Amino acid sequence: NTGPVIVIDGAGRVTLDGGGVRRILYMNTCDPELVWTTDHCDDQDHPRLTLQNLTFAHGNATGTAPDGGGAVFARGGRLKVVNSRFENNICDPLGPDVGGAALRAFDQSGDLPLYIVGSTFGGAPGRGNSCSNGGALSASGVSYTVLNSDLSYNDAAGNGANPPQPGTPGGGSGGANYNHGNTFHLTVCG
């Protein structure tokens, strides 16, 4: 967190690979090791992170806390994803409210939407992302605006719904996207 605006631009030549053993990117303004700039950590207006022209592959958030977000976990600040690819990322395959093999978001600053533009999540057989819910995307209390993007071949691997039905582990909602919370909007265009 060295400044309010951070752009990571791979120029279409950079792949960030978790090797199938770790989450690739973690941004959490509520992490107790970081300095809060507001009374409520989720309301920090920074960092304002843009990820563009990157590939995120083989991220793995199974067994991690906070859960979900095999490639990217974001809480607070602002996040935008532009012209990027997410392939073969995973998080826990079972459980309620575990989601977002590619990207999991909680509370963006000012309740503004998280933008995804011209990006691909999965996109072809053998490249999909998989998690209990939201094979590609998952959000809690976050609105998404998804423009000209491909969310295909992703898997919501859980079963038993959310909350889980008796005798089931829960999950299985939203192969492409799983949102929950009281107030949010999902806008998909293109």
What are these regions (language model features)?
Residues D9-R13, H46-N60, R78-D92, G110-G128, ...:
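Right-handed parallel beta-helix
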Residues A71, G99-A102, Y115, N133, ...:
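Ordered hydrophobic segments in well-structured contexts
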Residues N1-V7, T15-Q52, N60-R78, P96-D97, ...:
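Extracellular beta-strand-rich solenoid/capping regions of secreted or surface-exposed proteins
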Residues G18-R22, N60-D67, I90-G99, P125-G135, ...:
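Short glycine/acidic-rich loop motifs that flank beta-strands on beta-rich extracellular proteins
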